[in-house]
Amino acid sequence: MSSENLPQSPERAESPQAPRRKPRVAVVFGGRSSEHGISVVTAGAVMRAIDRTTYDVLPIGITTDGRWALTADEPERMAITDRKVPDVDRLTESAEGSVVLSVDPGSREVVYTEPGSVPKALGEVDVVFPVLHGPYGEDGTLQGLLELSGVPYVGAGVLASAVGQDKEYMKRVFLSFGLPVGPYEVVRPREWDNDPAAARERIVDFAGEHGWPLFIKPARGGSSMGITKVDSVEGLDAAIEEARRHDPKFLVESLLRGREIECGVLEFEDGPRASVPAEIPPVTSHDFYDFEAKYIDSAAGLVPAPLTEEQTAEVRRLAVAAFDAVSCEGLVRADFFLTEDGTFVINEINTLPGFTPISMYPRMWQESGVDYPELVDRLIQAALSRSTGLR
């Protein structure tokens, strides 16, 4: 990326009378996880929604090999086309240039470096809007870096992000707070590596107790990637291999028969509030609500969900309770099953839910009276008003 194409550093106010510059939002996206492409799509939607009369935007893409790259501010290129998701490598003009964020908590300075060139200061960042899904971004790693740097950021902190990414510990926290959780087993890397036969036998015993089919899923994944529905023991090995391709630790869950219900939580000045819930209807073209159903085939959810007043109140209460149990901040999407006996069971939360044009989280808040641009603005303003460090 040539120097003339680099974004200009925002002007500092030289006197109390000088106009204050607009807050600068760094939208960080991409990353090393298998959800790289969806992160790019989400970032494009967020960038389109940010009010440019109020904020400056600095797009920072992280390549699949972990390089922080300066990308063009062209959100229209960050969309699913021809059933293909975009990636950061196609959005950056330099294969070698890197963006560096200072870890000096008094700086907030961003610098662009390229081999053979003098580093160029890009100015300070006031707030980071991370839209990294999955490991190396949504799991507390990026949040830890931003805490070290003293840069405010949208969404959950280090602990809540880590718990929200690891389905095992998420369920443990839910259970400790008395939230209803379905049957599950965890197979850790050492268990599988040391004695896969014993681990496999434990899974078969779990199926004997709770019945087939089972869902085999990565413990620290998202967007339904790496999840397989297994109808019998014959499909078990392939499903485990697929899950471990995304994460060496995996979960085994029984099928909960019922309806899939989602609810958004957003932090307001007076505390977290829940949106109207949505329902994911059965997807006849897929075994379950998998990656393609979510993002490629545009499976439509029902917003609001056709629930009774009592059911709506209960799922909203549980969503806020899950938000509080994990000590979340900013936003969460909570996913539930409404079982055949009429009880809600929490499946998981997402601390950085998708913001693609068809994502359920913004749709639920749209129906609740908070449109997409206001939703993005509320999240940025909440981050700007919140300090880093212990809070």
Curated annotation (Swiss-Prot):
Short name of one Pfam family: Dala_Dala_lig_N
EC supergroup of this enzyme: ligase
GO BP terms in the entry: cell wall organization; peptidoglycan biosynthetic process; regulation of cell shape
Residues reported in the UniProt entry to bind Mg(2+) 2: 348, 350
Residues covered by region (Disordered): 1-24
Single Gene Ontology MF annotation: ATP binding
Compartment annotation: Cytoplasm
Pathway: Cell wall biogenesis; peptidoglycan biosynthesis
Gene: ddl
Cofactor(s), names only, from the UniProt record: Mg(2+); Mn(2+)
Protein name, as recorded: D-alanine--D-alanine ligase
Cofactor note: Binds 2 magnesium or manganese ions per subunit.
Function: Cell wall formation.
Domain ATP-grasp: 171-381
Plastid found in the keyword field: no
InterPro entries: ATP-grasp, ATP_grasp_subdomain_1, D-Ala_lig_Van_CS, D_ala_D_ala, Dala_Dala_lig_C, Dala_Dala_lig_N, PreATP-grasp_dom_sf
EC number(s) stated in the UniProt entry for this protein: 6.3.2.4
Organism: Streptomyces griseus subsp. griseus (strain JCM 4626 / CBS 651.72 / NBRC 13350 / KCC S-0626 / ISP 5235)
Keywords, sorted A to Z: ATP-binding, Cell shape, Cell wall biogenesis/degradation, Cytoplasm, Ligase, Magnesium, Manganese, Metal-binding, Nucleotide-binding, Peptidoglycan synthesis
Binding site for Mg(2+) 1: 335, 348
Family: Belongs to the D-alanine--D-alanine ligase family.
GO cellular component: cytosol
Substrates-to-products reaction catalysed: 2 D-alanine + ATP = D-alanyl-D-alanine + ADP + phosphate + H(+)
